[in-house]
């Protein structure tokens, strides 16, 4: 059985979601980015092995116009560095507004214990959960597109170049 891993690549964290081809996509985990793509690939390999993943779906941050900017180029470069170390096919998916939608799904961040502003730990936990939810939205969009359904994002962005296993 094949499983898909959705990835929301951020500057500090990587949000993950998992799904069988029939869906639904479910938030899975968030981990801190490593100092280099090879460290990220190692962390992903553990998840891929545990979850029996056969394909990755990576969110591609586009401008509102649909054009690729510097963040999209950085994402593509990261995939080019990580994919040979993982050996799985990668599909790109438009990720515009996924973090905003994830925040709407999760609701506002909880206040601190004293009713004041949230603590640093609470902010970090909330951001990690947002990253997971964004990955789930990216992955669900891809699943919906593959099954002819309506998506919240844009059109599929194509596949990354495949490498020999």
Short names for language-model regions:
Residues 2-7, 11-165:
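Phosphate- and other anionic-substrate recognition elements at nucleic-acid/protein interfaces
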């Amino acid at each position: 059985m094949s499983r898909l891993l959705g990835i929301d690549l951020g500057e500090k964290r990587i949000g993950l979601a998992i799904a069988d081809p029939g869906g639904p996509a479910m938030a899975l985990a968030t981990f801190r980015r490593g100092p280099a793509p090879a460290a990220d690939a190692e962390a992903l390999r553990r998840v891929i092995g545990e979850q029996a993943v056969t394909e990755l779906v990576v969110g591609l941050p586009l401008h509102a116009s649909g054009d690729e900017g510097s963040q999209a180029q950085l994402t593509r470069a990261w995939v080019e560095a990580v994919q040979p170390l993982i050996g799985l096919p990668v599909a790109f998916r438009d990720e515009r507004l996924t973090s905003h939608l994830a925040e709407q799904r999760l609701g506002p961040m909880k206040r601190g214990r004293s009713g004041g502003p949230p603590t640093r730990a609470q902010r970090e936990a909330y951001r990690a959960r947002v990253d997971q939810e964004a990955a789930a939205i990216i992955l669900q969009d891809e699943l919906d597109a593959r099954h002819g359904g309506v998506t919240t994002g844009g059109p599929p962005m194509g596949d990354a170049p495949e490498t020999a296993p």
